[in-house]
Design a protein with these regions (language model features):
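Single transmembrane alpha-helix segments in multi-pass membrane proteins
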Residues: 4-57, 78-83, 223-231
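Short loop segments and helix-boundary regions at transmembrane helix junctions
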Residues: 31-34, 74-119, 124, 204-208, ...
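Alpha-helical transmembrane segments within multi-pass membrane transporters and channels
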Residues: 24, 57-96, 141-145, 244, ...
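Cytosolic-side transmembrane-helix boundaries in multi-pass membrane proteins
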Residues: 165-172, 176-179, 232, 236, ...
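Helix-loop-helix "hairpin" substructures at the membrane interface of multi-pass membrane proteins
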Residues: 72, 130-210, 215
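Transmembrane helix-bundle core of multi-pass membrane transporters
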Residues: 87, 93-153, 182-183, 264, ...
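Loop-to-transmembrane alpha-helix initiation sites
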Residues: 13, 88-89, 115, 133-138, ...
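Transmembrane alpha-helical segments in multi-pass inner-membrane proteins
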Residues: 192, 196-267
Length: 295
């Protein structure tokens, strides 16, 4: 039996990690770029958020983390568009460099504690009672999801979508694809860093390894969401990413309740992503065999 506390925790974490799913929805699905900056950008958001919160500015930490994440996305885009480095390799290079940057932000310490510091959650606790973590996380995620959906309907947003669909056609239309890719990656990593910033204040700690495997977690949430919302408008796909993240956290909660070792969670995530991405190939391989068996 899953307790109320476990359900609340799954909802809270699902809303927080949904920002990563939305970020990957923009980079992986809209721009069609496998951005490997995600892990480092998430930790960067954690580091910036914790450092500024400890200094006494927990709310200022959120836009600051987003700005830092956007800078990380800009570097990846610069490597990709100006230096012509393949997108995956560009993300890996940026992610590797961010390890040192994140350590520097945290004062060359592997973790930062916020036990004695105010957070965005502790500030609203007197007003929201037992929902002081869920409501801010849910509202923030919904607002970001709405803003992303509205942005993708603007002229620039449509240009970004077109760049992911057919970059050659976009270039023929005199649209600067380097600019659209840069904007897309900056926004994507800003959302990832915001997720890390909120998680750091949620846990009241930031650790250099918090972002490890985040791209897999985000992809798992995104793909689960696409299963829930396979077709539809942009807002439905964004909603699917959010719901997928929440459902993923419930899957993890159930796995922990079944006494599965916590070390196995990353493996479970990897298997979910591999099966979901490879599902079309599996279906096409099974159908001919089934028809042959009937014949």
């Amino acid at each position: 039996m899953i307790s109320t506390a476990v359900i609340m925790s799954a909802l809270e974490l699902g809303c927080i990690y949904a920002l990563v799913a939305l970020a990957l929805f923009l980079s992986f699905r809209i721009l069609n770029i496998a951005d490997m900056t995600t892990d480092g950008a998430f930790t960067l958001g954690c580091a910036v958020s914790a450092t500024i919160a400890v200094a006494g500015h927990p709310l200022l930490a959120l836009p600051a983390a987003m700005a830092a994440g956007a800078c990380a996305g800009f570097i990846t885009a610069f490597l990709q568009t100006k230096l012509k480095i393949p997108s995956i390799l560009a993300g890996i290079i940026t992610n590797t460099g961010l390890y040192t940057v994140n350590l520097a932000v945290m004062g060359f310490s592997s973790n930062v504690s916020m036990v004695k510091a105010d957070t965005m959650f502790s500030l609203v606790k007197p007003f929201l009672g037992s929902f002081y973590k869920l409501i801010p996380a849910a509202v923030l995620t919904v607002v970001i999801g709405i803003l992303l959906t509205l942005f993708l309907k603007t002229r620039l947003g449509l240009s970004i979508r077109a760049t992911g669909d057919n970059p050659d056609m976009v270039r023929a239309s005199s649209i600067n694809t380097a600019f659209t890719v840069t904007v897309g990656l900056c926004l994507s990593n800003a959302m990832t860093a915001l997720s890390g910033a909120v998680l750091a204040q949620y846990q009241k700690t930031a650790d250099i390894n918090l972002g490890t495997g985040m791209v897999i977690i985000g992809l798992a949430s995104l793909i689960i969401g696409e299963t829930l919302m396979p077709k539809g408008k942009t807002w439905m796909k964004a909603l699917g990413a959010i719901l997928g993240s929440i459902l993923y956290r419930f899957i993890i909660a159930i796995a922990l309740r079944l006494d599965l070792p916590s070390e196995c969670l990353k493996l479970i995530s990897a298997v979910i992503v591999a099966l979901a991405i490879g599902l079309p190939a599996i279906k096409s391989a099974v159908r001919p065999a089934t028809k042959g068996g009937k014949a």
